[in-house]
Structure formats: C-alpha cells, structure tokens
Amino acid sequence: AAYTENVLDVLQRLKVSVLWRDNNSDSKGVALRVPYEDYRNPDNNPACDIECRDIGMLSGLPDYIDSREGDMLIVLHQMGNHGPAYERRYPATFQGFTPACNSTELAKCSHEEIQNAYDSSILYTDYFLAETIEILKQYQDRYDTTLIYVGDHGESLGENGVYLHGLPFAIAPE
C-alpha cells in the first residue's frame, strides 16, 4: 500500500474529499495518503468505556460534511463484530440476547452463549448503521448520498469446533 495507489488516492486526486475514520486496527496502509482520524481512544471517541464504540465515529460527522463542498467519500472502519470479545462490541443496553458469553475464552462458553453475544453485537451494528443513515438523510437535498456496507470476513461461531476467522476459505465450515 505504501508504493501503490488505491481507490482512495485516485478519488482524492480527482478532488473528492476523502476521510478515513478508524475504530478498528488501523487502515493497514490503505489510508496512508488521505485524512485519517483515530477513534480507538477517548481523545476522539466520546463513546468509550471498556472499549471505544463504533457510534463514536459519528460524532462531529455532520460538521465535517457541512465544511465540505463537492463530492466526498467517508470510510467508517468499524470494530463491528470482531471476536472473540463479542460482549465488548456493544454497550449493556444492547444485550438483546441472553445468556451471553462474557469471556474471550470461547471454549468456556456454550454455543448458545457465543451465538447470543455475537447476535447482540449484530444488533449494535444495526443501530450504528441506522444512525449513519439518519445522518446521510439530512444531506439528501444537497448530495446524492449512499451507504455501502462491506464486511471484511465471516465469523465461525463453533461450527465443527471452529471459531473466529482463522481458517482458509477452502476448509471453512459451510
């Protein structure tokens, strides 16, 4: 990524305002040459307790949009539903499925507890996406707004004794 242009570089060269907001594990070099904001700590993210929540990336987003003219691309790199600490991916108010696994040692939890913790993290992601859509709706008269959601990988929740996403696709459970 350091020596090769990617789509963000090309868009920026075409005068598209590009912003990468990160609440995950950095951009892995993808956002090296575009504006980058780190939301993995409470300095930028107002939604931190045991972990900084994805919803914090929406803080100040309308101000950013209001300060720009023309086309823009905003990347919100979520922590999302990454395991094994599913219970850290959502605040307690979003624990919609119980009993839930509250350990990173998934072998100590039942399949139901793991599934419930994961499902609660999905519930929180749904909330995050709904809030993002509400912000975009505010700009429909000024911009053609679009939300594109892309997951970076699937997740195994104990099927055939496999957890997380560490297996090659060829041998991953169906």
Question: Where does each model-flagged region fall?
Answer:
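Catalytic domains that recognize anionic headgroups
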Residues: 1-174
